[in-house]
């Protein structure tokens, strides 16, 4: 309970201090001392002056005299000036030249500084004095006054009987020391002393006869001091300063800190929260409205309203309106102008309408050219099926990609550009914009969209729909944001924590997806470009097969097709390359290369491998033949517990990459073997008839097809030349 009471007291004091810092003195604070007004940030008691600086604490004595330190206060200005009276300095001598009196002024101004409105003045004959000041830096100056009679010219302080020089601003310590050249013996009768003092410019008028004798018995002179709040600039304090409402902050010209002033049209104390009040110019004769106009006060300003029959001119005066004849011509001119503007506006609206109609017709034209009617007909005629193809609009695609902005590009290849798209429901998709190709490919494209949209496999990238209202069709599919298997094995996302268990699971998932495409899809699909760069991984490292731009649909009554060779070097089936005959065993070969990459951690085609062929398949076979199998396996995956599993996986990879397609297993057999290997239950083994030396020789005999590294040579759909190809890729 005591802790809570203590916290409450602290909070109350904090709020009180915050209000005080923001310029809220207590209501009972003294506002006058004698005939001098005391205005915040000045005050005469705690809680009444600005708490950040004791220099604002003034003293009002019992005689109602206001003091700044020991200096009487004349008045204060909220614009940053304080006028005080400062004692003069003097040194006096008798007729024999002996010093009889010496007063040297030494004054500290606290955080206030001298204003440049002051003048350093010396009065006397054969006299001189020094002014020494300090602040941010030190400053010294002096003044000399020479004369030999009291007939010196009055009103002039040019060095004859009186010397006066400017004083720089910004100094908070003042020391004045008067001196004499010869101690005044020759001028003692009319000038026994040297006087030196600071005085506000224009507040001292030299009279030779009186001033040389005794300075008219004046002992103090008005001096102007500059004051400001704190030691920071307006920019540094931002909104934490003390300036109230309807005021503005400006940096002090007399030193550090800042001052406040009311905005134009307001007056009052800018250091109080509501100190600046609106000036009613209409009752204070501060307006310039003419005799025919009526003044209307507004916040911070005023308006001059003209009576009926008058108008306001450029001089803010009210003059009679123009004659009816001239006004009639003005009306004609305005009517013509307005009519012309309406006609131009109508023409502009008509042009916009025509443009909109043309755009609509163009989108419809593209929709028909890209097979929109065919797609709608086939989807509507599919009956109860799992065909779910969403047709997106051209406007929706443009908004999703921010106008196909380059910052949304995920990747570019030979078959088109992939953009990251954000749909209205904030779901993220990948949008493939193909390169312009042959319009005769439309039926093949529509067929591919229909087939791929029916694929519902967790390890195959899902096609969501397409857009046919653009010059080239767009394909929309799910977005995978964790990179490709290639990136994790060799590239920017290389992950040393990609364990054997991860790699075996990825291989099993890819094999399962390919087996599904080959054997379980409504129409068998051969991917034709299986590689680590086309296998995407999500945040859980789940594999997703992507990029169906090179895929082929295999009719149910055929086992293979004759096609133009297409694929990626290092993964390309040698038999397919040599014969042009495409079947599901081509995907098996490519998968075998991927499995070797998972085992070895090496690229499918590398020209920097020492003591080993550049092709990974040949390198794998060579290492196996020469009993260097352990050297080619990635050291991060092999340990004493998994050597047998890795050897089994290597055997599967070797069987998948046999030279002759008929000797390779089918993908569903590969998937079953890997699944069995993964769960360590039953292992299905294939025939050993191809594991002899002859197979190794065949593998070693595979020629490297090109020296272009991992460049993909994509020609398009094989049955039609020079056509648009659409990759089904995810974000990469």
Swiss-Prot record:
The active site is at residue 529. The modification Phosphothreonine is found at residues 393, 563, 568. It comes from the Eukaryota. The chain crosses the membrane at residues 330-350. One of its GO terms (cellular component) is membrane. ATP binds at residues 410-418, 432. Residues 351-732 are cytoplasmic. It is a single-pass type I membrane protein. It comes from Arabidopsis thaliana (Mouse-ear cress). It is found in: Membrane. Disulfide bonds join 234-249, 243-260, 262-276, 282-295, 289-304, 306-318. This is Wall-associated receptor kinase 2. PROSITE patterns: ASX_HYDROXYL, EGF_2, EGF_3, EGF_CA, PROTEIN_KINASE_DOM, PROTEIN_KINASE_ST. Its EC number is 2.7.11.-. GO terms for molecular function: ATP binding; calcium ion binding; polysaccharide binding; protein serine kinase activity; protein serine/threonine kinase activity. It is an enzyme of class 2 (transferase). It catalyses: L-seryl-[protein] + ATP = O-phospho-L-seryl-[protein] + ADP + H(+); L-threonyl-[protein] + ATP = O-phospho-L-threonyl-[protein] + ADP + H(+). Belongs to the protein kinase superfamily. Ser/Thr protein kinase family. Residues 24-329 are extracellular. Its main location: membrane. Residues 230-277, 278-319 form the EGF-like domain.
């Amino acid at each position: 309970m005591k802790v809570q009471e203590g916290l409450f007291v602290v909070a109350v004091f904090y709020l009180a201090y915050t209000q005080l810092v923001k310029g809220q003195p207590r209501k009972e604070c003294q506002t006058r001392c004698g005939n001098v007004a005391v205005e915040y940030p000045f005050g005469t008691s705690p809680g009444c002056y600005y708490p950040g600086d004791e220099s604002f604490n003034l003293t009002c004595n019992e005689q109602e005299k206001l003091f700044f330190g020991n200096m009487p206060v004349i008045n204060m200005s909220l614009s940053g000036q304080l006028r005080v009276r400062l004692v003069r300095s003097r040194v006096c001598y008798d007729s024999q030249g002996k010093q009889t009196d010496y007063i040297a002024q030494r004054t500290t101004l606290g955080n206030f500084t001298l204003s440049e409105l002051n003048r350093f003045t010396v009065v006397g004959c054969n006299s001189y004095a020094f002014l020494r000041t300090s602040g941010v830096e030190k400053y010294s100056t002096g003044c000399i006054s020479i004369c030999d009679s009291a007939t010196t010219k009055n009103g002039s302080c040019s060095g004859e009987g009186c010397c006066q020089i400017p004083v720089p601003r910004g100094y908070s310590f003042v020391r004045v020391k008067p001196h004499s050249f010869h101690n005044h013996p020759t001028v003692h009768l009319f000038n026994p002393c040297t006087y030196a003092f600071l005085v506000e410019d224009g507040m001292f008028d030299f009279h030779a006869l009186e001033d040389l004798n005794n300075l008219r018995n004046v002992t103090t002179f008005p001096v102007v001091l500059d004051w400001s709040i704190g030691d920071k600039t307006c920019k540094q304090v931002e909104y934490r300063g003390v300036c109230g409402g309807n005021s503005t902050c400006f940096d002090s010209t007399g030193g550090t800190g800042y001052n406040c002033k009311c905005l134009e049209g307001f007056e009052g104390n800018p250091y109080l929260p509501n100190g600046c009040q609106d000036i009613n110019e209409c009752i204070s004769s501060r307006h310039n409205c003419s005799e025919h106009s009526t003044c209307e006060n507004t916040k911070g300003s005023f308006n001059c309203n003209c009576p009926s029959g008058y108008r306001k001119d450029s001089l803010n005066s009210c003059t009679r309106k123009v004659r009816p004849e001239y006004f009639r011509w003005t009306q004609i001119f305005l009517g013509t102008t307005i009519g012309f503007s309406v006609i131009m506006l109508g023409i502009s609206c008509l042009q916009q309408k025509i443009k909109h109609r043309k755009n609509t017709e163009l989108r419809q034209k593209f929709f028909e050219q890209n097979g929109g009617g065919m797609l709608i007909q086939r989807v509507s005629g599919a009956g109860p099926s799992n065909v779910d193809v969403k047709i997106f609009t051209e406007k929706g695609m443009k908004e999703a990609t921010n106008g196909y902005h380059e910052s949304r590009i995920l990747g570019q290849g030979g078959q088109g550009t992939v953009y990251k798209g954000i749909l209205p429901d904030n779901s993220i998709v990948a949008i493939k914009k193909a390169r312009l190709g042959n319009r005769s490919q439309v039926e093949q494209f529509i067929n591919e969209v229909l087939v791929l949209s029916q694929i519902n496999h967790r390890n195959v990238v899902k096609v969501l729909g397409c857009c046919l209202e653009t010059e080239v069709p767009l394909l929309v599919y799910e977005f995978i944001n964790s990179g490709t298997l290639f990136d994790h094995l060799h590239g920017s996302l290389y992950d040393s924590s990609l364990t054997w268990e991860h790699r075996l699971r990825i291989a099993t998932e890819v094999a399962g997806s390919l087996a599904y495409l080959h054997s379980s899809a409504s129409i068998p699909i051969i991917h034709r470009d299986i590689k680590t760069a086309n296998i995407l991984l999500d945040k859980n490292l789940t594999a997703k097969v992507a990029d169906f731009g090179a895929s082929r649909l295999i009719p149910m009554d055929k086992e293979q097709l004759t096609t133009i060779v297409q694929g990626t070097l290092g993964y390309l089936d040698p038999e397919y390359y040599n014969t042009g005959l495409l079947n599901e065993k081509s995907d098996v070969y490519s998968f075998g290369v991927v499995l070797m990459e998972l085992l070895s951690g090496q690229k499918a085609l590398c020209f920097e491998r020492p003591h080993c062929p550049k092709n990974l398949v040949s390198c794998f076979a060579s290492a196996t033949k020469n009993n260097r199998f352990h050297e080619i396996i990635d050291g991060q995956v092999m340990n004493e517990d998994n050597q047998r599993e890795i050897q089994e996986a290597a055997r599967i990879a070797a069987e998948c990459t046999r030279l002759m397609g008929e000797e390779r297993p089918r993908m569903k057999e590969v998937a079953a073997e890997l699944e069995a290997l993964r769960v360590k239950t039953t292992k299905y083994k294939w025939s050993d008839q191809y594991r002899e030396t002859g197979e190794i020789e065949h593998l070693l005999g595979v020629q490297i097809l090109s020296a272009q590294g991992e460049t993909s040579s994509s020609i398009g759909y094989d049955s039609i030349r020079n056509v648009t190809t659409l990759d089904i890729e995810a974000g990469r």
